[in-house]
């Protein structure tokens, strides 16, 4: 960027000196534009009407804009900044079951509006509940899988896992898991149907 002195017509006259010598710039004009900060009249002593109208017209009609008295809600907002409002804790709801570091989290269907710490068990309690739930579901799944092996293949995998967790009948779940996985019907989802029902 060039300096103002290099653009001056004469090398010995600077831009500041040229601004001081020019009568147009004394009035607050800069680069062809009038600068106005507050009072526009250079005299300041004489009474001059405002630029947007006359003072008598505004005073005679009585339409002066006054701030409305604040309501109680507005007073509270004025005294307390809006960022200091207490934030409500958002409840997190599971839409799909997922596993995190070996723990599976399922959606709970509790309708109670109790405390969030009471409604959501800790990880240890949830793990204990998962193991017992897998044991109960495993026996029911094995019976269903034996009756209809084609439609229950996704459940057979869950039954195999629960049987392994029980340490019991793995022979019954083994042949069903060895069958090719061609799920028939609307259950093309890899998640077991028991997890979808809960």
Curated annotation (Swiss-Prot):
<comment type="subunit">
    <text>Binds to filamentous actin (F-actin), but not to monomeric G-actin, independently of its phosphorylation status. Interacts with calmodulin.</text>
</comment>
<feature type="modified residue" description="Phosphoserine; by PKC">
    <location>
        <position position="104"/>
    </location>
</feature>
<dbReference type="GO" id="GO:0005516">
    <property type="term" value="F:calmodulin binding"/>
</dbReference>
<feature type="lipid moiety-binding region" description="N-myristoyl glycine">
    <location>
        <position position="2"/>
    </location>
</feature>
<feature type="modified residue" description="Phosphothreonine; by MAPK8">
    <location>
        <position position="182"/>
    </location>
</feature>
<feature type="modified residue" description="Phosphoserine">
    <location>
        <position position="119"/>
    </location>
</feature>
<dbReference type="GO" id="GO:0005737">
    <property type="term" value="C:cytoplasm"/>
</dbReference>
<feature type="modified residue" description="Phosphoserine">
    <location>
        <position position="22"/>
    </location>
</feature>
<keyword id="KW-0449">Lipoprotein</keyword>
<comment type="function">
    <text>Controls cell movement by regulating actin cytoskeleton homeostasis and filopodium and lamellipodium formation. When unphosphorylated, induces cell migration. When phosphorylated by MAPK8, induces actin bundles formation and stabilization, thereby reducing actin plasticity, hence restricting cell movement, including neuronal migration. May be involved in coupling the protein kinase C and calmodulin signal transduction systems.</text>
</comment>
<keyword id="KW-0597">Phosphoprotein</keyword>
<dbReference type="Pfam" id="PF02063">
    <property type="entry name" value="MARCKS"/>
</dbReference>
<comment type="similarity">
    <text>Belongs to the MARCKS family.</text>
</comment>
<feature type="modified residue" description="Phosphoserine">
    <location>
        <position position="36"/>
    </location>
</feature>
<feature type="modified residue" description="Phosphoserine">
    <location>
        <position position="132"/>
    </location>
</feature>
<feature type="modified residue" description="Phosphoserine; by MAPK8">
    <location>
        <position position="120"/>
    </location>
</feature>
<feature type="region of interest" description="Effector domain involved in lipid-binding and calmodulin-binding">
    <location>
        <begin position="87"/>
        <end position="110"/>
    </location>
</feature>
<feature type="modified residue" description="Phosphoserine">
    <location>
        <position position="162"/>
    </location>
</feature>
<keyword id="KW-0112">Calmodulin-binding</keyword>
<keyword id="KW-0009">Actin-binding</keyword>
<dbReference type="GO" id="GO:0007015">
    <property type="term" value="P:actin filament organization"/>
</dbReference>
<feature type="modified residue" description="Phosphoserine; by PKC">
    <location>
        <position position="93"/>
    </location>
</feature>
<keyword id="KW-0206">Cytoskeleton</keyword>
<feature type="region of interest" description="Disordered">
    <location>
        <begin position="1"/>
        <end position="198"/>
    </location>
</feature>
<feature type="modified residue" description="Phosphoserine; by PKC">
    <location>
        <position position="101"/>
    </location>
</feature>
<feature type="modified residue" description="Phosphothreonine">
    <location>
        <position position="85"/>
    </location>
</feature>
<feature type="modified residue" description="Phosphothreonine">
    <location>
        <position position="170"/>
    </location>
</feature>
<dbReference type="GO" id="GO:0005886">
    <property type="term" value="C:plasma membrane"/>
</dbReference>
<keyword id="KW-0472">Membrane</keyword>
<dbReference type="GO" id="GO:0005856">
    <property type="term" value="C:cytoskeleton"/>
</dbReference>
<keyword id="KW-1003">Cell membrane</keyword>
<keyword id="KW-0519">Myristate</keyword>
<feature type="compositionally biased region" description="Low complexity">
    <location>
        <begin position="53"/>
        <end position="62"/>
    </location>
</feature>
<feature type="modified residue" description="Phosphoserine">
    <location>
        <position position="151"/>
    </location>
</feature>
<dbReference type="GO" id="GO:0007417">
    <property type="term" value="P:central nervous system development"/>
</dbReference>
<dbReference type="GO" id="GO:0051015">
    <property type="term" value="F:actin filament binding"/>
</dbReference>
<dbReference type="InterPro" id="IPR002101">
    <property type="entry name" value="MARCKS"/>
</dbReference>
<feature type="modified residue" description="Phosphothreonine; by MAPK8">
    <location>
        <position position="148"/>
    </location>
</feature>
<protein>
    <recommendedName>
        <fullName>MARCKS-related protein</fullName>
    </recommendedName>
</protein>
<feature type="modified residue" description="Phosphoserine">
    <location>
        <position position="41"/>
    </location>
</feature>
<keyword id="KW-0963">Cytoplasm</keyword>
<feature type="compositionally biased region" description="Low complexity">
    <location>
        <begin position="156"/>
        <end position="167"/>
    </location>
</feature>
